[in-house]
Design a protein with these regions (language model features):
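Short, positively charged and aromatic/hydrophobic N-terminal segments
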Residues: 5, 11-12
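Compositionally biased non-globular segments, especially hydrophobic aliphatic-rich helices
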Residues: 11, 22-23
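Positively charged n-region of N-terminal signal peptides that target proteins for export
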Residues: 16-19
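Acidic, serine/threonine-rich low-complexity disordered tracts
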Residues: 34-165, 203-298
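Hydrophobic, well-structured mid-protein blocks that either form specific transmembrane helices
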Residues: 158-200
Length: 298
């Protein structure tokens, strides 16, 4: 399968396809990373509220002066970026298509304030299995604000996470009903936005990083190990990449049932740090998502 990215046997095949899609999507909750740099903290306004009855000489109503918002300028991902992936399953000599996944990043207006929105859309089995996720992160890119997932299959469900960065809480709803509250940390990301946070880090040297991630049931320090540089082939093209291996210890879902599960991610070794390949190995087989189409604003 050719890629257009440009750098700067088992018993139940349908169950395996579904596991492939859920496995690739679940890995987003794994991509663990990092406490925020201090300069990305909350911006404070120097506006001072006047005393009652006080009037300014220029007669302007300065009580309406808005708070200054600093919008994070990404180093690697881009506003308007879209990546389309083809997912396949491998077991022994057998290979078969398992589904499609699309990631996107966009700057939006969220309740009158600038925010970052990240989306994931996946499908398999001719549309019988669908998974949509949407993450909203504050303008400074320091904390998640909302996280929505809609899963349609035999176990269809709708999950909403509402983050309160000031109170350091996350409220979870399942199919419209309250489903618990958990504590978070000063800089906490959801299972989808953490993959974009990860791309922003300095991965030039091997090492290990950690960051707070909340899935609505728990907040945990998730770790990722930078293995080093590798060259991979997608279709007939070779790419220079950086291989990273997230720790699956806290990941829920298909990985939680397999202690030997392993996740590997290859990022482009260039200014984009695009996710070129995702590989998950569980007891059912190996699932691989390769970047097939990459769109980025000039």
């Amino acid at each position: 399968m050719p890629s257009v990215y440009k750098g700067a046997g088992w018993r139940h095949p349908e169950a395996m396809k579904r596991a492939a899609l859920i496995g690739i999507i679940s890995l987003a909750g794994l991509l663990s990373l990092w406490l925020l740099l201090a300069w990305l903290g909350k911006t404070e306004s120097n506006y001072r509220q006047p005393r009652p009855g006080m009037r300014f000489e220029n007669k302007e109503d300065k009580a309406s002066v808005p708070e200054t918002i600093v919008v994070y300028q990404p180093r690697h991902f881009a506003d308007g970026e879209v990546g389309h992936y083809q997912v396949r399953m491998e077991k022994g000599f057998l290979k078969m298509p398992a589904g499609k996944v699309t990631f996107a990043a966009q700057q939006i207006d969220h309740n009158g304030t600038t925010a970052w929105q990240f989306t994931l859309k996946g499908g398999a089995l001719g549309g019988l299995v669908q998974y949509d996720a949407r993450s909203i992160v504050n303008a400074q890119f320091t904390h998640s604000l909302e996280y929505h997932t809609v899963q349609k299959d035999l176990a269809s469900r709708n999950i909403v996470l509402q983050f309160d960065p000031q109170q350091q809480r996350c409220r979870r709803q399942l199919n419209g009903n309250p489903d618990g509250v958990v504590d978070t940390e000063p800089s906490t990301f959801d299972p989808l936005s953490i993959i974009f946070k990860f791309r922003e880090l300095n991965l030039a040297r091997p090492g290990e990083f950690a960051s707070a991630v909340c899935d609505g049931k728990a907040t945990f320090q998730s770790k990722v190990r930078v293995v080093g540089r590798e060259e991979i082939q997608i279709g007939d093209k070779n790419y220079k990449t950086i291989l990273v291996e997230p720790d699956l210890g806290q990941l829920r879902g298909v990985f939680q049932k397999d202690p030997d599960a392993k996740l590997q991610i290859w990022l482009s070794d260039d200014s984009h740090r695009a996710v070129l390949r995702i590989r998950t190995k569980v007891k059912h087989g190996t699932f691989i998502a390769d970047l097939a189409d990459y769109q980025r604003p000039e």
